[in-house]
Amino acid sequence: MTTMQLDSDGRLRHLLTLEGLPRATLLQLLDRAGQIRDAAVGRVGKRSVLAGTAVCTLFFEPSTRTRSSFHLAAQRLGADVLNFDASTSSTRKGETARDTLKNLEAMGVRGFVVRHPEDGAVERLAEAAGEGTALINAGDGRSAHPTQGLLDMLTLRQAKGTDFSKLKVVIVGDVKHSRVARSDLHALRTLGAGEIRVCGPASLLPDDDMLDGCVVGEDFDAMLEGADALMMLRLQRERMEEGLVPSLEQYHADYGLTRERLARAGRDAAVLHPGPINRGVEITDEVADGAQSCVLRQVANGVAVRMAVLETLLG
């Protein structure tokens, strides 16, 4: 898939996954996003980098943060933004996602931000895209969510510095169903994170090679010791079978992040969550809204990251 993302000169053509993405490309995107974020602090400007370029948010799954973030990012670069709603489109009449893309492409749309419930769906659409058309994966099934991975890495850089070699990161919760966890794991490995710990009930941990090289365990309290950053994951109840967790109350008792548990982690440990948060399940209000929470910073960084990606692909 990495080959499809890059053209013959090594330039990014699509952003489908962070798996196998060259370190230099990853750093280039993060550096550019950081520049955009720094320039935007205290003001919201509009640029003309993508003036005259049409970008479509092609979402076949519900979204609030990601869709709004991409819309704002494209607007701030001067693009014309078309929001596609699957519930009111010809897909209800049987039109395939591929035909939808090709028809919009024929109208002059050059950039597609795609979210889809099926694993690998965005890659298949990228194979069908014409020359000069760029696709960005905004989350497909359990496979990947590359811009979330990028904004998480940008948030970690801001909180902990650019050298990840001594960083101890704990990813907690429903790893099995999480495309965010997959993208974060690929990015952390590429950036040379010192130690990646993965914690959750056995029923919510993947049984493939996704966790190779990670410290894996079910004891949340033990995993927290000395951690520099905690990535709390949402329970993907829409993707999981019944009975994978006994109850939400029991899950919170075992894996919910409370102020008392946070005290076990390293001093000033950063707390991240991709949202939407199930308050009182993955994380308490006190922690979500506390001084160590980076949740809203992640949201703010999302616009900068998506501007950097759109600019790189279409500018």
From Swiss-Prot:
It catalyses: carbamoyl phosphate + L-aspartate = N-carbamoyl-L-aspartate + phosphate + H(+). Carbamoyl phosphate binds at residues 65-66, 115, 145, 148, 275-276. Pathway: Pyrimidine metabolism; UMP biosynthesis via de novo pathway; (S)-dihydroorotate from bicarbonate: step 2/3. PROSITE patterns: CARBAMOYLTRANSFERASE (PS00097). L-aspartate binds at residues 93, 179, 234. GO terms for molecular function: amino acid binding; aspartate carbamoyltransferase activity. It holds the Pfam family OTCace_N. One of its GO terms (cellular component) is cytosol. Catalyzes the condensation of carbamoyl phosphate and aspartate to form carbamoyl aspartate and inorganic phosphate, the committed step in the de novo pyrimidine nucleotide biosynthesis pathway. Heterododecamer (2C3:3R2) of six catalytic PyrB chains organized as two trimers (C3), and six regulatory PyrI chains organized as three dimers (R2). Belongs to the aspartate/ornithine carbamoyltransferase superfamily. ATCase family. This is Aspartate carbamoyltransferase catalytic subunit. It comes from Xanthomonas campestris pv. campestris (strain B100). The lineage of its organism: Bacteria, Pseudomonadati, Pseudomonadota, Gammaproteobacteria, Lysobacterales. The gene is pyrB.
